[in-house]
Every structure is written in C-alpha cells, then in structure tokens.
Amino acid sequence: MPFYEIFIISVALAMDAFTIAVACGLCMPEVSKRQNFRLSFHFGLFQALMPLLGWLAGLTVKSMVETYAPWISFFLLAFVGGKMIQESFETDDSCDTYKDPTKGLSLVFLSVATSLDALAVGLSFSIMDYPIAFPCVMIGITALVLTSFGLWLGKSFAKASSYSHIAERIGGVVLILIGLKLLLQ
C-alpha cells in the first residue's frame, strides 16, 4: 500500500481523536503539558494498537466487530459526555477523574472509543494481506499529533470565552453527538 494511502487513512482515523481533543480542550481551559501528553499519548497508543489487534483477529471476529463497534463507541462517548454536562451544572470546581479526561476511566473510555475504527481498519488490512507494522506506527503518530493540536485548539477557544461552564456543556454535547454519528453510520 502506498505511503499516501496510509497517510490518508491515518488522518481519517485521527479525526475522532482530534474532535474529542477539541471538546476536552473546551472543558479544560488550563491544560498542562502533562495532561496534553497523557491524552495525546494514550489516543496515539490506542490508535496504533487497535489496527494490530484487528489484523491479528483476522476474519474470525469481523462480523462481531462491525456489528457492535458503533454501540460500544456510542455508550462510552455518551457516558463521558453526559458526565461532562452533569458536572458543568455543579458548583464544585474540584477536578476529579471526569473533569480531567486525561486521567482514570475517562481516559480509557475515550481512548477505546476513538480507536475502534482503527480496529476495523486492521481487520481489513488482514483480509487484504497488507503488512501492518508501518500503518500502525503512522496511525499512532498521526493520532498523537492531531490530538495534541486539537487539545490546544479547544483550550484556545475556551480561553477566549469567559463562559467555561457553557464550553463544558458544549464539549459534552459534542462527545454525545460523535457517539450518535458513529452509531448511525
């Protein structure tokens, strides 16, 4: 498979991670380098590993992955988005695992939800007998870079707005809408 095709696939797979990173940045107007690294690293890692898992699974689980992946993504994103919306109405400003999507279960849920498409791509690479090592690296690096940029972009928009609770609600709604989009595809 030519480099440009792998690059296009990598960018397409990273769009969910980018969009979710923007939503997270909207909810976290103060994003540390450590938080940026955690989110970018985990999104990139999951995006890189899922095609490998899909490739290894081959044809045996193809129909199950295609059937349930949209539902899994929807529930994970709806859960995190719903928590963000709920917490935007709370007056307590303490940062727990849901307010900081770069920690705990929120990070795991978001990482899995953004990378399920990559699992299906790995499955298709297996079916077409394409090698998987270079695409995994390219997909992971692209997701890492676009996640970091998306987080910065969301943070920049949030800083421009003095309505951080509204930004958090918008971020939660965006996550739920992405989940619905994945469900309805």
Swiss-Prot record:
Q: Which InterPro entries match?
A: Mntp/YtaF, Put_MntP
Q: Where, if anywhere, are coiled coils annotated?
A: none
Q: Which GO terms describe its molecular function?
A: manganese ion transmembrane transporter activity
Entry annotated with the keyword RNA-binding: no
- Similarity comment: Belongs to the MntP (TC 9.B.29) family.
Known role: Probably functions as a manganese efflux pump.
What is the protein's given name? Putative manganese efflux pump MntP
Q: In which organism is this protein found?
A: Maridesulfovibrio salexigens (strain ATCC 14822 / DSM 2638 / NCIMB 8403 / VKM B-1763) (Desulfovibrio salexigens)
